[in-house]
Amino acid sequence: MEKNYYALAYYYFGPVSNPHEEIALHKQLFKTMDVSCRIYISEEGINGQFSGYQPDAERYMAWLKQRPDFATVKFKIHHIKENVFPRVTVKYRKELVALGCSVDTSKQGKHISPEEWHEKLQENRCLVLDVRNNYEWKIGHFENAVLPDIETFREFPAYADRLAQEHAPETTPVMMYCTGGIRCELYSALLLEKGFKEVYQLDGGVIAYGLKMGTGKWKGKLFVFDDRMAVPINEADPNVSPISKCSLCDIESDTYYNCANTDCNNLFLCCESCITSQKGCCSEECSQAPRIRTFSAERGNKPFRRKHLCPTIEQTRCCLREKDNQPA
């Protein structure tokens, strides 16, 4: 019988009295559950991405809300068919989001609901800012959004300076969004520090917008940091037309792969035809490389893990094991 799973996205900014104790309690709880996750906890809060068998996911949500430090956490839920993380990862991370500079998160932009966000988009009065990385917005974004060509969140402080130079901060209203909302908590605070007076952030991010409003003013798919890689923002509208193209032949494609060449591992967009002919590689050069991991259409575009070693590495390890087992 097919089991139902949940994918959960959630975060909480606020004081955590003993993050290491919380980490230990999480790990202990998960030993009895069919789950996988990537959860970071620090003195400033929690940032969680989680997948689990539905009863276990519901048990975890109830348990976390009973924890004194996390009583107000909000979960965004997607229905999935299997766990989407390779393992259970719960660890301490001082920066829940790697911005690279400190900001006063007690002063943030105004949180607006998906319904309010949709109305403001129709007014077409604000600068709509995507605060995700370029490979994320390449496959999906809001109509008429400003799309910074940035590869990591650490580049955004410098972009904030540029934004303040290109637009009059005191008279330019800004609406910002990210996947689940946590990056906006920091970036809205940063823009306020730069002098912007009217800053709005989409409460719950694109995930919450999709759950409440459907596709609405969104184009394409949503990049997610798990085995799914890309999802429609609303389960009721799965057949979304791609807005991006295959990097090899230029036909429409919104499917990301990691290059099968171990020494490259580049994240790239590719169509089914090209990914098959290139043996899972991002270029002809990589397809001829000596250390290529085995690609198969059956595994789809799931990211390669440590277990997906190329034959050359496997052979080397086997030889070393055989050598170690030789009598002296």
UniProtKB/Swiss-Prot annotation:
Matches recorded under Gene3D superfamilies: 3.30.70.100, Rhodanese-like domain
Protein's GO biological process: tRNA modification
GO molecular function: oxidoreductase activity, acting on paired donors, with incorporation or reduction of molecular oxygen
Highest taxon, organism lineage: Bacteria
PROSITE patterns in UniProt: RHODANESE_3
Alphabetical UniProt keywords: Oxidoreductase, tRNA processing
Catalysed transformations (reactions): uridine(34) in tRNA + AH2 + O2 = 5-hydroxyuridine(34) in tRNA + A + H2O
Coiled coil: none
Family of this protein: Belongs to the TrhO family.
Role according to the record: Catalyzes oxygen-dependent 5-hydroxyuridine (ho5U) modification at position 34 in tRNAs.
Name of this protein: tRNA uridine(34) hydroxylase
